[in-house]
Amino acid sequence: MRYTRKDYETFLSTELETQMREYARLVETKAIVLKERGDVFVGRFIKLQENGMVVFKVRVNDNMPRKNTFWTASYFINEMGSYKNWGELSWAELRKQYQRDCSEALCAWLSKSEDSNFCLVGIKNISVEFAQILEKERPIIAFGPSDPPLEYLMNLIAIVRDTNCAVTKQILDYEPSESNNWNPTKVESKEDLNTLLAQKLQVNNCIAIQGPPGTGKTYRMAALSAELLRQGKSVLVTALTNQALIELVKKKDLKDFLDAQKVTKTSLTVDESKELPKLQPNKKNLCNAAPGYLSLATFYLSSAWAKDAIEIPFDYVIMDEASQALYPMIAASVKLGNKIIWIGDQNQLPPIVLTGDDVINRYDWGGIVKGFNTLCTNFSYPSYMLKDTFRLTERGAACTGIFYNNDLNSVSKVQTIKSSIDCLNKNGWPTFLGMDLEPGDKTPTLAISSIIDLVEEILSEDKDAKIAVLSKFRPTVRQIQKQFILQSKKSEIPENVKIETVDRVQGLTVDYCIFFIPNASLKYSLEKELFNVATSRAKYCTIIVADKSLMGKDMEEEVRKYLLKSQDDKFVAFNSTKNITAGNVSVNVLGKIDLSKFEKKRKEIVEGKENIYIIDTNVFVNCPNIIDRIGHKYKVIIPAKVLEELDKLKLKNNIDKNALNTAARNINLAFTKQFSKMEDADISLLPVGFDKNNPDCQILSVALKYKGENPIILTSDNILQTRAKGLGITTISLTDFLRQLR
């Protein structure tokens, strides 16, 4: 078998521990520091609207929350309502000692206030009890980190531990296929998918469906659910997000069942019930299978039902967003239904996990993370691919089709764009806008301002145009949202403008999409699945904003081909062979040689991570040209403390002044050419017991900022090396570093 039960449990336990550790690190940080970083914000209650939305007033000069982000709203007693009194208390200590009440919260919108020093924030998902306190006392509320979904992982651990369950054995204990079994039947939009599925399900219990962007996955699943309900079947639709469930139940095929109060949903919120008053709450979130009824539940709750199930409760289970399910969740679904339909897209985003890529690669856990892909490539269940996209133009489908073996076909009624805006391709091609972006800067002011100007220009031409502004990074999105409120002529971010991270928009359809790629940690923005999601949202045009030099960066072949198309073939890809002649001489070019293959592999480098060198003071003293020796392939960070120490060394008599001057010139040149940058210490990241005034500890705190990547402290200081290794930070001495370059 590919994975033992111990393998599954070890991965899930590792992810559980990682989430707990990251959450603990966050909440044990001083609350005032979290506020300065944007991980906590405070607002004064203004009003409770009829639709269940709660409005708060927040200072503009604070870090405002991103739209559609989850928080824990905490009401602190007495003087602790003011952040100025938080002192040295951590967020956890504040909640433990001073919290009177709390509620889950979701930031739904941002808006300007009559007072230019403040903005308004709309919050939903507030509990009824908490809302009553707000209306009565009108307090200041602090919003902090939301709790991680630990119960979901614990449910999956219980499922993989159960070796006696016959139905999960066929999924969990599979033998890997020697070849890729994924060869789906292509389904056109005019074909009756329900009839095809009904025929296959007579002799098969499971079916897998791939739904590329805009192919009508949700519409098809709503139609299938309605047909099954008419047959008197009990049906469960489960998905990762509540939003996916709400989008499904809003489809017209389910209206009669909604009106008949035959559709229930777990964890129904006030705003959801306002939007869909006939949707019934599953008040205790218990498994409620019943003939002719549709149950809606997220993975977090359906996994609990699967854990506790002794007999299979539902006739049919439809797993939407299956590509966002961990493989044990795929197994959990077969405990819930006699017939299973998985629908997802293995070329879009997999589940988000906090366990590092290096750990996942080391233990070969990729197949557990990308569960739907594992299912599709190793099992020979009947499979289908929806090949007609209603969203994309012919040219848009040609670009996105690169990710689908060019099998994507456009049936959109829109093929050309009626716009006078110069940068929008009138024929539906994606557009590439190259700018000069500073390396390492995730919130470049000029680029963000230009993006907002473009959004305003589109809205001035069509005020109802649906626009998405997407980026990989949360700080980028937070800054764009904030600047839109401050810079735009609008009083708030309109409902038809969505500014969000890519991982939160799978399934979104808009008219125009602007995908902003900051010149920082590029490999994450250019990751194939994420790039595909970001560039396949728009019906009319996708605009990619990035650094001019982007095409010179390393990226996967499909992404490069897409970008080449987006630049109207200004760049071309060579064929596998090319003939060059000069006079009587002829040469066949068969390919290219990657010279990096002949370089010695550095032992401190980790593949799949961004490798970042943090250089200690003693290294510059002994090797002034160290930045050149590292090379421009890797990011180099100079802690501000190092520059301060180098400056002080000039006052000593027994120091090589020429070496210091050379080091200073090289650092200045590296800063000018953007090969390197300076960073201040963040002593809040240091563990308890570390001397926050110690220079070594301050240098160490710079490395801790990049703990999610592979920070490498280059130092000859044995004590600093020991401290770094104790915190899991890679270190290498100057001697060892230079030796491996020989």
Model regions and ranges:
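Conserved helicase motor core of SF1/SF2 NTP-dependent helicases
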Residues: Q231, A239-Q243, Y300-M319, S323-I612, ...
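Hydrophobic anchor at the beta1->P-loop junction of P-loop NTPases
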Residues: I209, V237
